[in-house]
């Protein structure tokens, strides 16, 4: 019997299995698909996700090599067409060397299929993971202290079987059938817009030689959508709006899609191959509950975040990092069942903030449309022609472009989110969302433990790499007392186990006798002004929801 059943083997489901395995927890990972994803879909793998990957032995540096270099995918461009006039540009996220002050691994543009392939290789090699493609979970119900599942062979529906597990994670996507079967409702708008994702192959390097970028927003009247450059030499997507109520998907033939691509590029192309055409609906919803009994929602099944901001996939990875160590602690007898209640308490607010920001990003793009087209439909062409000729004569255009910055730089949301729950002792208040690009490292309880470049045995490395992803870490001040008899807690002494160029008191705001207790997910669980057995054990009892 698997300890945990994971339904859905996308990046979130695979990451859940790998994280659980790191804690010694075996899982069964199933997916109804018989083949892996080929369409590019998501591409922004942010700093926090890369840090999590690195913590489980998936080299973040090697992952970043799969993505577009910053000089290829480091800009967002607002254009008429791909080859038409350009009205402004912005850096795409924090890919500059300055980001290394806050994270060892800046965001990288990695097509989702490539990211999934790397995860899949690690999953396939992990003896703790039973990985089954072509397996549909048709029923998942709470049954006392277990979860009962019915699994069906996707290739032969006459073959089905039942199994029991201690817990289950539903990572089965935005249209989660498990969420629906649990009667968990979603909050927020269900259908903001409808798009066709037209995935095509073409070598457009010659056309973008002087305007490399990852996103090209198209504003020429009659040209709608966004071009996404996953690889300028071969892999592109045109996001094209459509109306499913008045249009039929079958009307979008390859020939019609090729014509739309020509229009978006601004000239007729040769050597274009339309690979895939798939519809999708932009929503902005968060589940009212992340848990029902012993079944948990994670990733898109828990939140449908608009793609404007690249926060969806990364939020899902954050979900399972938060959940996995808690499940492992309970299953290994180290924590009480109540610890699992903190999953929703901590992750749901993060999803709501990310959802709201992504929705605001999408809405702000309309301000740019108005700046370019005006508010009189009959004069759209006239205004656009004037702006195309003399964009500097329209200062409101530059302001509208500048206002898009939060869309493409949400560094604080990506690595600066905080938690406030019973699994944090005396958490600092969570501040209101301000400038989402302005990340300020915090040493407060509940905050993500800050990255520092430190030296150990002559080697420069991130302090993150010394924090255990498998157990609690006690980072002690230079004059603090060592705690004996706690083999399950990793202890680090500031200035001895590693060297930092800055002062402990200046960094942490704690006396040299103090310490920080850091959870396996890298969040600060509590702060100690002095380290003593009584306070330490009291904190452990609260953090792990133990009644002893």
Residue positions per predicted region:
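Conserved FAD/dinucleotide-binding core of flavoprotein oxidoreductases
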Residues: 80-114, 155-159, 209, 219-276, ...
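Core beta-strand elements of the Rossmann-like FAD/NAD(P) dinucleotide-binding domain
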Residues: 157-167
């Amino acid at each position: 019997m698997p300890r945990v059943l994971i339904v859905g083997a996308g990046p979130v489901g695979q990451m859940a299995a790998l994280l659980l395995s790191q804690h010694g927890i075996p899982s069964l990972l199933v997916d109804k698909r018989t083949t892996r994803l080929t369409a590019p879909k998501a591409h922004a793998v942010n700093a926090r996700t890369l840090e999590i990957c690195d913590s489980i032995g998936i080299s973040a540096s090697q992952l970043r090599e799969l993505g577009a270099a910053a000089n290829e995918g480091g800009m967002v461009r607002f254009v008429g067409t791909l080859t038409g006039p350009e009205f402004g540009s912005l850096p795409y996220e924090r890919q500059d060397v300055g980001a290394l002050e806050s994270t060892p691994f800046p965001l990288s543009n990695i097509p989702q299929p490539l990211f999934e392939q790397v995860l899949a290789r690690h999953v396939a090699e992990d003896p703790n993971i039973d990985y089954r493609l072509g397996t549909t979970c048709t029923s998942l119900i709470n049954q006392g202290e277990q979860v009962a599942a019915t699994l069906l062979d996707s290739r032969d529906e006459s073959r089905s079987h039942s199994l029991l597990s201690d817990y289950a994670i539903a990572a089965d996507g935005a249209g989660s059938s498990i969420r629906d079967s649990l009667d968990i409702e979603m909050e927020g708008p269900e259908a903001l817009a409808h798009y066709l994702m037209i995935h095509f192959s073409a070598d457009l390097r010659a056309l973008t030689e002087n305007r490399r970028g990852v996103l090209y927003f198209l504003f020429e009247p009659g040209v709608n959508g966004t071009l996404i450059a996953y690889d300028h030499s071969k892999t592109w997507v045109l996001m094209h709006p459509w109306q499913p109520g008045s249009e039929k998907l079958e009307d979008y033939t390859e020939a019609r899609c090729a014509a739309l691509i020509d229009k978006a590029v601004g000239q007729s192309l040769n050597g274009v191959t339309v690979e895939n055409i798939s519809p999708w609906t932009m929503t902005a919803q968060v589940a009212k509950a992340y848990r029902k009994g012993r079944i948990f929602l994670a990733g898109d099944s828990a939140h449908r975040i608009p793609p404007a901001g690249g926060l969806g996939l990364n939020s899902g990875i954050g979900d399972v990092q938060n959940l996995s160590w808690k499940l492992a602690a309970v299953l290994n007898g180290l924590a009480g069942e109540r610890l699992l209640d903190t999953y929703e308490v901590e992750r749901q607010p993060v999803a709501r903030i990310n959802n709201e920001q992504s929705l605001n990003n999408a809405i702000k793009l309309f301000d740019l449309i108005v700046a370019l087209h005006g508010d009189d439909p009959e004069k759209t062409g006239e205004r656009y022609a004037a702006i195309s000729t003399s964009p500097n004569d329209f200062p409101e255009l530059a302001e509208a472009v500048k206002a898009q910055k939060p869309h493409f730089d949400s560094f604080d949301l990506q690595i600066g989110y905080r938690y406030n729950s019973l699994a944090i002792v005396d958490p600092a208040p969570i501040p209101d969302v301000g400038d989402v690009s302005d990340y300020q490292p915090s040493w407060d309880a509940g905050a993500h433990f800050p990255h520092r470049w430190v030296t150990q045995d002559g080697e420069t490395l991130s302090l993150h790499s010394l924090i255990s992803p498998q157990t609690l870490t006690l980072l002690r001040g230079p004059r603090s007392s060592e705690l004996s008899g706690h083999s399950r807690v990793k202890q680090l002494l500031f200035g001895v186990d590693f060297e930092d160029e800055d002062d402990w008191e200046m960094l942490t705001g704690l006396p040299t006798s103090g310490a920080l207790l850091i959870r396996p997910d890298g969040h600060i669980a509590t702060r100690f002004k002095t380290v003593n057995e009584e306070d330490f054990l009291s904190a452990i009892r609260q953090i792990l929801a133990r009644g002893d």
